[in-house]
Amino acid sequence: MPPRKKRRQPSQKAPLLFHQQPLEGPKHSCASTQLPITHTRQVPSKPIDHSTITSWVSPDFDTAAGSLFPAYQKHQNRARHSSRKPTTSKFPHLTFESPQSSSSETLGIPLIRECPSESEKDVSRRPLVPVLSPQSCGNMSVQALQSLPYVFIPPDIQTPESSSVKEELIPQDQKENSLLSCTLHTGTPNSPEPGPVLVKDTPEDKYGIKVTWRRRQHLLAYLRERGKLSRSQFLVKS
């Protein structure tokens, strides 16, 4: 199909100008008539001192905006702006008086101490051992712990003394009685008594039979003997 011809938009006509106001007032009922202003009040004016009006402004911001951001001039040697150069910020950076403290210093307990930096290849070749587990810390030697990049430093906790002396003082009969009492207490708790049975289980020979005929077994047997009831009528559709 040939392309459609582009129609020129009709030029907007200028609004009609009325040299005289309507004699009967505004045509719309919702519009209110404007009364001439007759009562005017004269308020004493105070001259503005431009030297003191900006006295509270910081001197860093006294520079005019035009000097910082000159107006863009079109068609002015675009080849110069093709290669962008790193520009420095026109405003100074903010400086903080006190350095920010890390979260570990606020806690007061150094949990992890970083060892001297090592290459990533050496660290990746080593076997993965959970350093923070107490069993691995007990089995590993001091040199192996020092060779790892991160070492767990446990807090100062007093370990209890060995109870070998106390075990010698306890007789053998008392030990056996305590073991029997522990096994009795740690057994499975007594299960609560079952409540009343709300719905009985369906026997296997009645699976697939509709509830209506399951409750009327004598009627179901009578109709099946007479051949007046098909299987699709009393069996559940699967």
Swiss-Prot record:
Gene Ontology CC annotations of this record: chromatin; chromosome; nucleoplasm; nucleus; site of double-strand break
GO MF annotation list: chromatin-protein adaptor activity
Cross-referenced Pfam families: RHINO
Sequence motif RAD1-binding motif, residues: 55-61
Annotated tissue distribution: Weakly expressed in testis, prostate, ovary, thymus and small intestine. Expressed strongly in breast cancer cells.
Induction remarks: Up-regulated in breast cancer cells.
InterPro entries associated with the record: RHNO1 (IPR029293)
Phosphoserine modification, residue list: S51
Region Disordered, residue ranges: 1-31, 74-105
Bias type Basic residues, positions: 1-10, 75-84
Main location: nucleus
Motif (D-box): 125-132
Mutation effect (S51A): Abolished phosphorylation by PLK1, leading to decreased interaction with POLQ
GO BP, one annotated term: positive regulation of G0 to G1 transition
Task of the protein: Involved in microhomology-mediated end-joining (MMEJ) DNA repair by promoting recruitment of polymerase theta (POLQ) to DNA damage sites during mitosis. MMEJ is an alternative non-homologous end-joining (NHEJ) machinery that takes place during mitosis to repair double-strand breaks in DNA that originate in S-phase. Accumulates in M-phase; following phosphorylation by PLK1, interacts with POLQ, enabling its recruitment to double-strand breaks for subsequent repair.
Free-text note regarding domains: The RAD1-binding motif mediates interaction with RAD1.
Assembly information from the UniProt record: Interacts (when phosphorylated by PLK1) with POLQ; promoting POLQ recruitment to DNA damage sites. Interacts with RAD1; interaction is direct and promotes association with the 9-1-1 (RAD9-RAD1-HUS1) complex. Interacts with RAD18. Interacts with TOPBP1. Interacts with UBE2N.
Name the record gives this protein: RAD9, HUS1, RAD1-interacting nuclear orphan protein 1
Organism for this UniProt entry: Homo sapiens (Human)
